Amino acid sequence: MSETDAGAPGAPEAAEGQAPGIRILAQFIRDLSFENPRAPDALRAAQTQPQIDLGVEMNARGREDGLFEVDLKLSARATRDDGALFVVELLYGGVFQIAGVPAEDLEPVLLIECPRYLFPFARRIIADVTAEGGFPPFMLDPIDFAGVYAARKAQEQEQVGHA
């Protein structure tokens, strides 16, 4: 699910008077996969809209240089009654420098705000690759990363309660 290392060497400490800040130092595709198992038959117009299952995961980890790597994993599977139309998976990453954020607030910044910065770029990649696969561009709706984070934390708490 999510992994953070708030105690990484060089992790930012909230200095008095220092304004919180997030700098994106790099963005990159870590992994990209597109499957079009029924091409070209699946490309014909159909009477029914496909069912699309969407998956979202966010992960973060501290690096030794005091920076943080954040990964946003998006997966989408489009199906109709007669089977899969396409499957796309993207693992999009970024390297962030975080300043002026107290340690107790670092995890939400890494798993909510940083993915929020990465999302428009990842969304565009998925739209482009589905269009290149012969389908209309798949434009992801905006994602409520705070809601996803809260749901994951609740699930983690539930698992701890059952352990």
From Swiss-Prot:
One of its GO terms (biological process) is protein tetramerization. Homotetramer, a dimer of dimers. One homotetramer interacts with 1 SecA dimer. One of the proteins required for the normal export of preproteins out of the cell cytoplasm. It is a molecular chaperone that binds to a subset of precursor proteins, maintaining them in a translocation-competent state. It also specifically binds to its receptor SecA. The keyword Cytoplasm applies. Keywords: Chaperone, Cytoplasm, Protein transport, Translocation, Transport. It is found in: Cytoplasm. The gene is secB. InterPro entries: SecB, SecB-like_sf. Signal peptide: none annotated. It comes from the Bacteria. One of its GO terms (cellular component) is cytoplasm. This is Protein-export protein SecB. The keyword Secreted does not apply. Belongs to the SecB family. GO terms for molecular function: unfolded protein binding. It comes from Phenylobacterium zucineum (strain HLK1).
